[in-house]
């Protein structure tokens, strides 16, 4: 079929299989350029990525496999394509990853199902025992609006809302490319609690606990989960909002898991990453405008990093750095690995603060990198690539080495 982008709200409802494959190939090429052959043996060897099909989770898997030659098992929840309808971008990303990894002679296997379920954990443990033995890195990168509690089956939903008072700010209506005033009502106590349940550290702990009890964690195994803190511009909706409470719970879990894994010479950390265009960030009010501003400023200063650049740096300069003194990782006072350091530079943030009140619908494309934001957004779904002929017929069915739960 011939597939064109169809955007509804902050989701593109169509995806392009070849475009997604080229995106993954590009991440692999970047990784090879960033991580020298001489450092290949310094990284992880057997890696489990929970939330492995898009965004930072996909980049974590690409970095492990193509930067360090690791065997990888990916867990995600995606929809396969059919003859009549394209699948989700994550499905095609995972299919492309599998194809490229196998061509390289690397072990690659995936589980498609609810990563919050006990069943997913059991299947992962079974595959690790059968194929990998033990794993030395567990990457936790789930971003989901809903979590089905594994014991009761109860559904909990996360809320992207402020706490205490209504938050009103300048934002972009991405459907109309217009600057609007966006207001978000504050979260109720129940919504805050549910957001912590969905996006907090509980499920990360359940995963590490299950892996540990099953004996599939290698001595010295590490685990990392991803977070974002941001700055004053996004704090009301993010760090000081319901989502921030969930991310604080992630910090709590990291402390518990660090103590547990530390008994065998390993450890756990939250990695705080920079803001990038992902399906997750597109859903957060104010983020598209903030990202459009910060991309422009950081590109002008030669500091811009995409998703894969961040993950390459996380592995190379933080998790597996040769600079680490006696195995100590360079963290902030809360034990977090900070990769938002360039974004949080005073000059970068001041430039964004100065830009923010000036942006109007008329100057949106000139004052900010909103054009770049839109392009990156569509690229997530396989569109806007110069090396793909979008008038050509493409097969929406992609089969690969995946266990369907």
UniProtKB/Swiss-Prot annotation:
Enzyme's top EC category: oxidoreductase
GO terms assigned for molecular function: enoyl-[acyl-carrier-protein] reductase (NADH) activity; NAD binding; trans-2-enoyl-CoA reductase (NADH) activity
Binding positions for substrate per the UniProt entry: 228
One Pfam family linked to the record: Eno-Rase_NADH_b
Catalytic activity: a 2,3-saturated acyl-[ACP] + NAD(+) = a (2E)-enoyl-[ACP] + NADH + H(+)
Site (Plays an important role in discriminating NADH against NADPH): 78
Gene Ontology biological process terms from the UniProt entry: fatty acid biosynthetic process
Subunit field text: Monomer.
Its job: Involved in the final reduction of the elongation cycle of fatty acid synthesis (FAS II). Catalyzes the reduction of a carbon-carbon double bond in an enoyl moiety that is covalently linked to an acyl carrier protein (ACP).
Protein name, UniProt field: Enoyl-[acyl-carrier-protein] reductase [NADH]
Source organism (scientific name): Chromohalobacter salexigens (strain ATCC BAA-138 / DSM 3043 / CIP 106854 / NCIMB 13768 / 1H11)
